[in-house]
């Protein structure tokens, strides 16, 4: 469930940030900022639904998913295929996120 939640949060965050990127860097219509803001609010709300006990741990685990999702965005939306270094870095980050997320923390 955590990975699905983080995946949805990543889609909302990346979409929201890309709306700002589109306006400020690509000269798109400023009306794109409204759905961008809504998307960023949805992202923040989704991240609070995490089962993690501490916010910092949720953010750290989410970070790996965000990186992988950003590379999917790069490929599917921006039309640039991630290279082997992108993929290697994403795998390292996902491994770290898995350790943070699924580690047994019982005493």
From Swiss-Prot:
It is a multi-pass membrane protein. It holds the Pfam family UPF0060. Its main location: membrane. The chain crosses the membrane at residues 1-21, 26-46, 58-78, 87-107. Keywords: Cell inner membrane, Cell membrane, Membrane, Transmembrane, Transmembrane helix. GO terms for cellular component: plasma membrane. It is found in: Cell inner membrane. Belongs to the UPF0060 family. PANTHER family: UPF0060 MEMBRANE PROTEIN YNFA. This is UPF0060 membrane protein glr4174. It comes from Gloeobacter violaceus (strain ATCC 29082 / PCC 7421). The lineage of its organism: Bacteria, Bacillati, Cyanobacteriota, Cyanophyceae, Gloeobacterales.
């Amino acid at each position: 469930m955590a990975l699905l939640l983080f995946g949805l949060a990543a889609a909302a965050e990346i979409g929201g940030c890309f709306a700002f990127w589109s306006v400020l860097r690509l000269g798109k219509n400023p009306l794109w900022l409204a759905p961008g803001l809504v998307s960023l609010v949805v992202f923040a709300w989704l991240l609070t639904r995490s089962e993690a006990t501490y916010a910092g741990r949720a953010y750290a685990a989410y970070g790996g998913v965000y990186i992988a999702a950003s590379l999917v965005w790069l490929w599917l939306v921006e039309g640039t295929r991630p290279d082997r270094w992108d993929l290697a870095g994403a795998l390292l980050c996902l491994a770290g996120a898995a350790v943070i997320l699924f580690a047994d923390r019982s005493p």
